[in-house]
Amino acid sequence: MKNEMNIQFTALSQNESFARVTVAAFIAQLDPTMDELTEIKTVVSEAVTNAIIHGYENSGQGNVYISVTLEDHIVYLTIRDEGVGIPDLEEARQPLFTTKPELERSGMGFTIMENFMDDISIDSSPEMGTTIHLTKHLSKSKALCN
């Protein structure tokens, strides 16, 4: 059975935890393992933080959009902003690369997303924003409920 959820919220750092918890609560119906749930929460946190800090440059202007589709123990996650976009996507995907060293960012966001998810694709255009598509196949064990 297919189930979908869409949320939109203002690009404020205090909304990052709301996004993480909301997505985790929605995904919980598939009974993921604790590791799977933690990985998805971490990925949501990284993507939303990137949208807020880099996409909107921490301005509080604009929205972050999250779409989650659950189907046959697969999580399809899309996180989108309408911010400044990523000028050099290849460079941005390199471990330790950051455009905000003054904020003590580690530059590991995309690396974490790539390691925790089964598939990731990123679409970005200058001044048009960024869309990240992520896919995770969940195990069929019921470890979370045991």
Curated annotation (Swiss-Prot):
Catalytic activity: L-seryl-[protein] + ATP = O-phospho-L-seryl-[protein] + ADP + H(+); L-threonyl-[protein] + ATP = O-phospho-L-threonyl-[protein] + ADP + H(+)
Keywords annotated in UniProt: ATP-binding, Kinase, Nucleotide-binding, Serine/threonine-protein kinase, Sporulation, Transferase
SMART domains: HATPase_c
Source organism, top-level taxon: Bacteria
One Gene Ontology biological process: negative regulation of sporulation resulting in formation of a cellular spore
InterPro entries xrefs: Anti-sigma-factor_SerPK (IPR050267), Anti-sigma_F (IPR010194), HATPase_C_sf (IPR036890)
A GO molecular-function annotation: protein serine/threonine kinase activity
EC number from the UniProt entry: 2.7.11.1
Matches recorded under Pfam families: HATPase_c_2 (PF13581)
Function: Binds to sigma F and blocks its ability to form an RNA polymerase holoenzyme (E-sigma F). Phosphorylates SpoIIAA on a serine residue. This phosphorylation may enable SpoIIAA to act as an anti-anti-sigma factor that counteracts SpoIIAB and thus releases sigma F from inhibition.
Family of the protein in this entry: Belongs to the anti-sigma-factor family.
Protein name stated in the entry: Anti-sigma F factor
